[in-house]
Design a protein with these regions (language model features):
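PAPS-dependent sulfotransferase catalytic core
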Residues: 1-94, 99-100, 116, 129-135, ...
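Generic structural signal for small/hydrophobic residues in well-ordered secondary structure
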Residues: 13-14, 83, 97, 113, ...
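The conserved 3'-phosphoadenosine-5'-phosphosulfate
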Residues: 32-33, 181-280, 298-305
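Surface-exposed cleft-lining segments at the edges of enzyme active sites
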Residues: 68-70, 96-101, 158-172, 229, ...
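PAPS-dependent sulfotransferase catalytic domain
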Residues: 75-89, 144-221
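ATP-dependent NMP and nucleoside kinases share a basic, alpha-helical "lid"
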Residues: 105-123
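Short N-terminal helix/helix-N-cap motif within the alpha/beta-hydrolase-1
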Residues: 105-108, 134, 203
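Canonical radical SAM enzyme core domain
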Residues: 127-130, 199-200
Length: 305
């Protein structure tokens, strides 16, 4: 049903790569970029209300529409008949692809993807785990899901078990070794790219991806990064406006002109940056895992230190 999948990791350039692949005539990219079909651990019935507001599922109205379905970023597809609909116009010589970044983390995806799709290729971008976690934190802060400092939120997040839709998983999604080991034994053809190398030379990276997928070579569609991060000045106020019933009511009843001014005023003038002390502290969560990953991959990852 699917020929190749971009399996992760979140905040590591997967949306940019998916955007490039969508422009390739040899690829039929899914109408839902991240359908999460093979990650059975992800259950919207158990997601927090705040998480669901940021990451809503595709509802019955969406599926009632005729093909081709409108493009959307994410859903939690469980029915095979619905999963098949996300490639309505795939040609016989096109690769059917999707880009669920939950898959690298998901044991069920590593177990079931290759079993259901013999010969499937799995592509993963791995990023410096501290930078990945910090980028994830900035996104969560922008959406009002956290309001503490990066280290405070990383400490809090790492103290519990990973649970998609209930926690942010800043730490868990930056621990790569177990997932890499699972996917190496999954039966899928695993292709691994290092984010820092890939986007330092995007033209060479794009050529490598096309070769790995058996695609004819075309020029890089664009060099711009998709979904660049923005920061907010007042994360507690953002959380109130987006997730408290009164805040949502007030925002919903604002005149559009006032709402646009409020949004502009809420943006921080400068991006958040890690201090050296914060980076050193955060690295302690990931150092042992990176050392283990080096052994599994058989390569040096000192570019992350």
């Amino acid at each position: 049903m699917v020929n190749a999948v971009l399996i992760g990791v979140p905040k590591s350039g997967s949306t940019t790569l998916a955007d490039w692949l969508q422009e390739h005539p040899g690829v039929a990219m899914s109408r839902i970029k991240e359908p999460n079909f093979y990650a059975s651990e992800l259950d919207p019935l158990h997601f927090s209300p705040a998480f669901l507001r940021i990451s809503p599922d595709a509802d019955s109205d969406y599926w009632a529409q005729p093909d081709p379905l409108p493009r959307r970023h994410q859903a939690f597809v469980r029915q095979p008949s619905q999963y098949a609909r996300i490639w309505p116009d795939a040609g016989p010589n096109q690769l059917r692809m999707e880009a669920s970044t939950s898959y690298f983390w998901s044991p069920s995806a590593a177990r079931d993807l290759a079993a259901g799709n013999p010969g499937v290729k799995a592509l993963v971008l791995l990023r410096n785990p501290v930078d990945r976690a910090f980028s994830h934190y900035r996104m969560a802060r922008k959406y009002g899901l956290v309001s503490g400092s990066f280290i405070e939120e990383l400490d809090r997040d790492a103290s519990g078990s990973a649970s998609w839709g209930q926690r942010e998983n800043f730490a868990a999604l930056s621990l790569y070794a177990d997932s890499y080991q699972r996917w190496s034994a999954s039966g899928a053809a695993l292709h691994t790219y290092i984010y820092e190398e890939a986007f330092q030379n995007p033209h060479a990276f794009w050529a490598e991806v096309q070769q790995d997928l058996g695609l004819s070579a075309i020029a890089l569609p664009h060099a711009e990064r998709v979904h660049a991060a923005h920061d907010v000045r007042w994360p507690a106020l953002t959380a109130f406006a987006q997730h408290h019933w009164l805040g949502r009511w007030l925002v919903g009843h604002m005149p559009r002109s006032l709402k646009m001014k409020a949004i502009a005023a809420s943006l921080a003038p400068e991006p958040l940056r890690l201090t050296e002390a914060e980076r050193a502290k955060a690295w302690t969560y990931f150092a042992d895992d990176v050392a283990r990953l080096e052994g599994l991959m058989g390569r040096n990852l000192s570019l992350w230190t």
